[in-house]
Amino acid sequence: SDVFIVSDMADSQQKYAMKVEKQHGNIRAVLKLDVMVLSCMQRRGVVGFPMMIAAGRTSAYKYLVMQMLGPDLGKLRRSLPEKRFSLATALKVALQTVDRLHALHDAGWLCRQRREGAKSGGWNDEQDNGQIYMLDFGFARRFRDTEGNLIRPRANAALVGTFQYAPLAAHAHKDQSPKDDLESWFYMTVELIKGPLPWGNFKDYHQMGNYKKAIRNEKRSDFLSGCPDELGTIMDSIDRTQFFEEPQYDLISREIRSAAARADVDLEMPFDWQIERWMFRRAHFVGDLGESNMASERLANADDSDNDRSSLPVDATPPLESR
């Protein structure tokens, strides 16, 4: 699907995001799932999911109009020289995103696409509300039916979502459950704290899967080095959870808060991009895989008198897939 910025005809200052998808010829139709999940969360009054304004179709296209949001977490993270957030921001994001997953699971849905695709709350730095929003549900799947009954796992399942964050169950072509969403969330959280994941440049998903197994054994200490000790407890809790078992969301949140307290981190402080306002501008120039040379040139010539950081070194090297 393609995304456009649109305005309210009655108020040109009111901006929205419109996702558009062809009626036919898509490799994978995703807009229907976006509408189903967002309308479900909207009916439940859950925070942290973009408000759906309108949805419909024409003879050629399907469309979804929704609340305009800011850059995704991946672009904000990659806008930084070290490609990682401060510990305070990483833990705040972790706390909010695990709450979003808990709400999604309570509604009977799996995300199956947990990556840094969650977004900040404003489409520019002045409108940011400190809220992290979850969106992009093209790979979502129900694990409970409409009566609330658990759906039996299939014998085989396709590997879907972003390989970097795929859980071990996905690598084994098994159906996923809420604990697998949390495993993907865990990889994302480590990346927010430390920077690109060690398997980020691997081309083969089997190789990625083998490395993910190794971090449970001989590579555990290397993988978790530089992270609060509490992350080891969180990983163990996720790994112990069985397919039909409810994950220990409360334990995970407690451990994140414990990590913050032990590191003397104030979880009420603003996000990095709310302090360093140049991050918003720079994130808009960062592509899905990295920062382009053209973006670097535009940033170097940019004029932003408010908290100007255009003189900072800009990474103009060819992007790595992990970035």
Regions flagged by a language model, labelled:
Residues 51-62, 70:
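Short beta-strand micro-motifs within the conserved protein kinase catalytic domain, predominantly
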Residues 69-79:
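Structural motif in protein kinase domains
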Residues 2-34, 39-40:
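ATP-binding glycine-rich loop module of kinase domains
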Residues 101, 105-129:
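Catalytic-loop of the protein kinase fold
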Residues 93-94:
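Activation segment signature within eukaryotic-like protein kinase domains
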Residues 217-226, 247, 252-254, 261-323:
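Extended, low-complexity, intrinsically disordered C-terminal regulatory tails
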Residues 152-170:
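Conserved activation segment of eukaryotic-like protein kinases, specifically the C-terminal portion
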